[in-house]
């Protein structure tokens, strides 16, 4: 029989999983998502999350508690009498009363190979660390931060030039298929649970503004991983002095390149940039207020001479 599911998620990453559960014939009793946030050009309009919008199209009740500190919100969750809660990038901590508030508990779709990269930014951190693979896991949630037993795993390779945005999309769809499979096995009583290893724990801290600036004194491999791990958002950047003013330029893609020089020096007309060891060549750039451009197109409008130092 189909399961009665409470779905909990917020960003675009969560939407394919919700759609997959509906397609599989499960009953979505309710959708929980974060409250609408100020948005629009002036930040005056309240914008609903991608999951909120998807749920409304499905005609499913949507709840947007700020947290679960209010007893009425916790009771409302239990009153749905759901078989299971499916959680994908919800963004709120769940108290034990919620974790145990359905027949089978809460199952989370997490974008890493746990216990590596527990926490808020597993996709970015995996690329920034130079990992060659990552994956999606379905785990049963407990009171710890991504510490629960693992049910299913799908490994996904990370290409040498793959950006966080590209990996996000691969994992988003892999996660939807994996959760769909997990719910079938849960229905049949055949969903295995394996405790996470005690070794290899790493935490994927939220990306801070302070770490988005590119440090060209680092080895080229680290700079390349930094750039692609932050692309397209929030975007790694450098500053360039032009016509007596400082301009910030985002680098949304790069490739390793041959070359050597003082870190931050432009080595040729293709914008190869010297690093602490080796060099990188940006492949996609964006200036403030502009649209992303392939580097040759960017340089056609704004050439940067070899020998220029960037900071």
From Swiss-Prot:
Q: What is its EC number?
A: 2.1.2.9
Query: What is the protein named?
Result: Methionyl-tRNA formyltransferase
Q: Which CDD domains match?
A: FMT_core_Met-tRNA-FMT_N, Met_tRNA_FMT_C
Name the InterPro entries on file: Fmt (IPR005794), Formyl_trans_C (IPR005793), Formyl_transf_N (IPR002376), Formyl_transf_N_sf (IPR036477), Formyl_transferase-like_C_sf (IPR011034), GART_AS (IPR001555), Met-tRNA-FMT_C (IPR044135), Met-tRNA-FMT_N (IPR041711)
Catalysed reaction, written as an equation:
L-methionyl-tRNA(fMet) + (6R)-10-formyltetrahydrofolate = N-formyl-L-methionyl-tRNA(fMet) + (6S)-5,6,7,8-tetrahydrofolate + H(+)
Q: What does this protein do?
A: Attaches a formyl group to the free amino group of methionyl-tRNA(fMet). The formyl group appears to play a dual role in the initiator identity of N-formylmethionyl-tRNA by promoting its recognition by IF2 and preventing the misappropriation of this tRNA by the elongation apparatus.
Q: Which organism is it from?
A: Sinorhizobium fredii (strain NBRC 101917 / NGR234)
Sorted UniProt keywords: Protein biosynthesis, Transferase
Q: Name one GO molecular function term.
A: methionyl-tRNA formyltransferase activity
């Amino acid at each position: 029989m189909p399961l009665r599911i409470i779905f909990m998620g917020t960003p675009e990453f969560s939407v394919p999983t919700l759609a997959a559960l509906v397609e599989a014939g499960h009953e979505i009793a309710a959708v929980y998502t974060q409250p609408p946030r100020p948005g629009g050009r002036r930040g005056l309009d309240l914008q609903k999350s991608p999951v909120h919008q998807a749920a409304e199209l499905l005609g499913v009740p949507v709840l947007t508690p700020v947290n679960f500190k209010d007893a009425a919100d916790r009771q409302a969750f239990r009153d749905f009498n759901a078989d299971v809660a499916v959680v994908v990038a919800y963004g709120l901590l769940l108290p034990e009363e919620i974790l145990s508030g359905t027949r089978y508990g809460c199952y989370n779709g997490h974008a890493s190979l746990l216990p590596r990269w527990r926490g808020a930014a597993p996709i970015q951190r995996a690329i920034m660390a130079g990992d060659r693979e990552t994956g999606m896991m379905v785990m049963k949630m407990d009171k710890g931060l991504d510490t629960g037993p693992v049910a299913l795993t799908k490994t996904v390779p990370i290409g040498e030039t793959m950006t966080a945005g590209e990996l996000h999309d691969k994992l988003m769809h892999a996660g939807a298929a994996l959760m769909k499979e997990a719910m079938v096995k849960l229905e049949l009583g055949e969903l295995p649970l394996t405790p996470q290893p005690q070794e290899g724990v790493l935490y994927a801290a939220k990306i801070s503004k302070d770490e988005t600036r590119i440090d060209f004194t680092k080895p080229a491999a680290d700079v390349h991983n930094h750039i692609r791990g932050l692309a397209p958002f929030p975007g790694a950047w450098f500053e360039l002095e032009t016509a007596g003013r400082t301009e910030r330029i985002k680098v949304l893609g790069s490739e390793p390149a041959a070359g050597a020089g003082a870190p931050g020096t432009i080595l040729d007309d293709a914008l190869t940039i010297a690093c602490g060891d080796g060099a990188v060549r940006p492949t996609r750039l964006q200036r403030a207020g502009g649209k992303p451009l392939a580097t040759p197109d960017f340089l056609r409008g704004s050439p940067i001479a070899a020998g220029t130092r960037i900071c």
